[in-house]
């Protein structure tokens, strides 16, 4: 009987080590670098519009309009933002006030760009297609294309809260 009890105890301890552990934050940065052709398209847009922006290592460009003073969000942070997204032709494809997201669940350009500011900060991101929606058309509820494939995305984002 002691042998069976000992075996059961051993097996329960052994198998408990196989249980799924809390993996922490499931999100990660993909370390994607946009191709030079996409970077050149952004540079051409910036030049044509007399804009100055800082290059990120991913070949995205950004302007910190207000750095903020609060917390910097991590990938698993809940963020509250006001934003407007436009195309290089000036068409606004989306805007929201008080939008709530988990940073890590968003497009790569946002995962890389939003942590460049703190709570209360404002940033403008010039996101190449590779860090945005890539070669896919984005459609609205009616099926109309609101973001054509391979579009550069321009986002004006204010980080109002980090949770």
How should each PLM-predicted stretch be described?
Residues 18-163:
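Cross-family detector of peptidyl-prolyl cis-trans isomerase
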Residues 1-18:
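Sec-dependent bacterial lipoprotein signal peptides
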């Amino acid at each position: 009987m002691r042998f069976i009890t000992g075996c059961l105890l051993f097996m329960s301890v052994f198998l408990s080590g196989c249980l799924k552990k809390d993996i922490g934050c499931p999100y990660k940065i993909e370390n994607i670098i946009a191709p030079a052709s996409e970077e050149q398209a952004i540079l051409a847009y910036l030049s044509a519009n007399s804009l100055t922006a800082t290059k990120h290592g991913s070949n995205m460009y950004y302007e910190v309009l207000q750095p903020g003073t609060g917390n910097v969000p991590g990938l698993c942070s809940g963020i509250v933002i006001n934003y407007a997204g436009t195309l290089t032709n000036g068409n606004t494809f989306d805007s929201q006030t008080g939008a709530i997201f988990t940073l890590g669940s968003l497009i790569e350009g946002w995962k890389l760009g939003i942590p460049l500011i703190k709570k209360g900060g404002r940033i403008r991101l010039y996101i190449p297609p590779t860090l945005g929606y890539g070669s896919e058309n984005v459609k609205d509820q009616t099926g109309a294309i609101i973001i054509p494939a391979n579009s550069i995305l321009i986002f004006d984002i204010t980080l109002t809260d980090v949770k």
